[in-house]
């Protein structure tokens, strides 16, 4: 990813040293990103989700007294952006964009009520057994098999109605069907061709645009000291 836009090279076209420096840094940055992206995942890294990265777009503008950087950072909070100087003429802008979302899938249709063993439950699966019993007058009457059968039926009904210990997590009420916005970590590095005043740098984030103003350092002036 270019450290400066291609148009920025043109402002220093008369000085080949600056142009070569920018192109060298640009090529090195591109090579580093390609190596990191093509590195094979081994060991425990295979089971971890790689960190998503993206590169926000910046405009770099030079005035007579300052350098101005304007970057697109929509939907990011200012507390998640860090700006620092790694050396007197290099500024690094990094941060992170986080959004919680769940990939959506069409809801599955339930074919029927399942029992604890996962088999279809049918009302006809349980029948009360009866047998003929003869009373003292030799009359045949229909009675239930035993009182134990009733107790067993009640226990089965209680187990069927009781919630299972292993319950699947409930699906979220809201889902994202499409996620196209950039999320993850980002980092941009800019190297200025001249000395800058780090103590006077200002930054603001309004309407998704990060604006950084870097004043140029005052030129060193020769001071003559008179001898008394």
UniProtKB/Swiss-Prot annotation:
Q: Which GO terms describe its biological process?
A: cellular response to heat
Start and end residues of each sHSP domain:
49-228
Q: Does the keyword Ubl conjugation apply?
A: no
- Annotated region (Disordered), positions in chain: 34-53, 117-136, 144-174
Where is this protein localized, as stated in its record? Cytoplasm
Question: Known SUPFAM superfamilies for this protein?
Answer: HSP20-like chaperones
Is this entry keyworded Ubl conjugation? no
Extra information: The N-terminal putative helical domain may be the site through which HSP30 binding to mitochondrial membrane is regulated.
Q: Which family does it belong to?
A: Belongs to the small heat shock protein (HSP20) family.
PANTHER family given in the database record:
HEAT-SHOCK PROTEIN 20 FAMILY MEMBER (PTHR11527)
Name by which UniProt lists this protein: 30 kDa heat shock protein
Origin organism is Neurospora crassa (strain ATCC 24698 / 74-OR23-1A / CBS 708.71 / DSM 1257 / FGSC 987)
